[in-house]
Amino acid sequence: IKLFLSDETIDKFRGIEQTVNAPAINKTDANKTAVNKKEQSLAIVYEDDEVLVVNKASGMLSQKAKKEDRSLVEYITDYLMTRQQQQDSVFRPGICNRLDRNTTGLIVAGKTVESLQYLNRLFKERELHKYYLCIVKGCIAQKETIDGYLQKEEKSNKVTIQKAKKEGSVRILTAYEPLEYGRYQKEEYTLLKVDLITGKSHQIRAHLQSIGHPLIGDH
């Protein structure tokens, strides 16, 4: 899944982007050098004493898939450790939402036990909403909520969408609203704002493709 965000949209979320710059360091300090290199991958959108919001880069894992992986969680932990915000605490920051590896977008992290628990509750109870911007093939003229059932094949990690419930399938709901429409090389495209009412693997791409509007790059 690819997430396409305009500069204007990003600016609305973050005000002025803060990109973490590595401070001057002693060249003989290999550990600090490694940490500073990791810091450069963090684009901080918002930060206070309790919360950190970053714009995850494409290609970066939200969380480890394997023990040897370096994910956004490790980058955030290193960033806070270098600023002595977590050195005297057994608590390590955690993220409250995840994005696919190739998806760019905002991820929220709690810097304290209390803030992490509070933010997780907001996400779980849908008091805090996540929206995705994506470009799809074809013209979509009006906003709509679509319903269906998602069937996942675990071995191949592929999903199919059906209108009726089958054994092993789960119900999905996807709401979308068209924001812009245009043409490119005689093809029609629509920029959508998507709200995952249910959040399942590959839901956006599979559900939109099932109604004849695949994400660009998927057709």
Regions flagged by a language model, labelled:
Residues I1-H219:
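RNA pseudouridine synthases
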